[in-house]
């Protein structure tokens, strides 16, 4: 498999492309083949709670009610597959505790802190995904 990772976290931008969320799907043609390569390669794909929340927010903010409902249905069907274990990714087990708050505030992954990341226009959702990834790495011992 060469450069194929063993574990990846599914980012919000990937979820919105896979779900074809209008206005958030501009990289869909690039994301689908990469996603399929991961599925075919047996890569463990972790679905962070932050990606679920952000994707739901993007769907809820769609102006067109018909498109909003269609995207919401796709989102719900996808989450049902995750819940039943038939989706190719698994939900990240997240404990919201002081240690997680510490990971959010001080990232070992990026080597800087929350203030610096926000000042560099890195959103809180992306910061939380990094914190979730750090927690997963600690728990699983997979880097």
How would you describe each model-predicted region?
Residues 1-50, 58-76:
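Short, well-structured N-terminal submotif of metal-dependent ribonuclease cores
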Residues 50-51, 128:
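Short beta->alpha linker loops
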Residues 77-78, 133:
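Structural element of the ATP-grasp superfamily
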Residues 83-143:
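Active-site neighborhoods of divalent-metal-dependent phosphate/nucleic-acid chemistry enzymes
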């Amino acid at each position: 498999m060469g450069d194929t990772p063993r574990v990846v976290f599914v980012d919000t931008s990937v979820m919105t492309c896979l779900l074809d969320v209008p206005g958030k799907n501009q990289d869909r043609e690039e994301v689908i083949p990469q996603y399929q390569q991961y599925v075919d390669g047996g890569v463990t794909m972790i679905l962070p709670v932050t990606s679920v929340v952000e994707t739901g927010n993007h769907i809820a903010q769609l102006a067109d009610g018909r498109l909003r409902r269609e995207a919401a249905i796709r989102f719900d069907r996808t989450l049902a597959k995750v819940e039943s274990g038939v989706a190719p990714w698994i939900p990240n087990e997240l404990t919201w505790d002081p240690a997680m708050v510490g990971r959010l505030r001080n990232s070992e992954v990026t080597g800087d802190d929350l203030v610096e990341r926000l000042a560099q226009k890195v959103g809180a959702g992306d910061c939380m995904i990094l914190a979730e990834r750090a927690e997963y790495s600690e728990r699983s011992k997979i880097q």
